Amino acid sequence: MFVKSTTRHIRIYAAEVHNSELVESDNMLTLDVDPDNEFNWDEDALQKVYRKFDELVEAASGEELSDYNLRRIGSDLEHFVRNLLQNGEISYNLKSRVLNYSMGLPKVESPETEGAYNL
């Protein structure tokens, strides 16, 4: 079994993809963002996640390739995705097969509540 980190929206594997299969690797990480398509993504938001991933991997260079270290990166990326959602850079995909609002209920403004809950 290869080293991996799986969160709700981020999956990281110490593996490469060959013929649509994951093949264990000691020098390659594969990132799967939002595998259940819970969010609507544009290319800019995805690139932000990829850049953050690269930054976190670079910061961890020289450390052991372990489940623990990958989970730290995965957890940091999960929080990053939450920030993208809270900042309105991504949104829930209401046509997704998964509608559990795992990062909080969607914010819907109405004339009665507009601006009432700003912190």
Swiss-Prot record:
InterPro entries: NdhM. Transmembrane segments: none annotated. It is a peripheral membrane protein. It is an enzyme of class 7 (translocase). The keyword Calcium does not apply. Its main location: membrane. It is found in: Cellular thylakoid membrane. Keywords: Membrane, NAD, NADP, Plastoquinone, Quinone, Thylakoid, Translocase, Transport. It catalyses: a plastoquinone + NADH + (n+1) H(+)(in) = a plastoquinol + NAD(+) + n H(+)(out); a plastoquinone + NADPH + (n+1) H(+)(in) = a plastoquinol + NADP(+) + n H(+)(out). One of its GO terms (cellular component) is plasma membrane-derived thylakoid membrane. One of its GO terms (molecular function) is oxidoreductase activity, acting on NAD(P)H, quinone or similar compound as acceptor. The keyword Ribonucleoprotein does not apply. Its EC number is 7.1.1.-. NDH-1 shuttles electrons from an unknown electron donor, via FMN and iron-sulfur (Fe-S) centers, to quinones in the respiratory and/or the photosynthetic chain. The immediate electron acceptor for the enzyme in this species is believed to be plastoquinone. Couples the redox reaction to proton translocation, and thus conserves the redox energy in a proton gradient. Cyanobacterial NDH-1 also plays a role in inorganic carbon-concentration. PANTHER family: NAD(P)H-QUINONE OXIDOREDUCTASE SUBUNIT M, CHLOROPLASTIC. Belongs to the complex I NdhM subunit family. NDH-1 can be composed of about 15 different subunits; different subcomplexes with different compositions have been identified which probably have different functions. This is NAD(P)H-quinone oxidoreductase subunit M. The lineage of its organism: Bacteria, Bacillati, Cyanobacteriota, Cyanophyceae, Oscillatoriophycideae. The gene is ndhM.
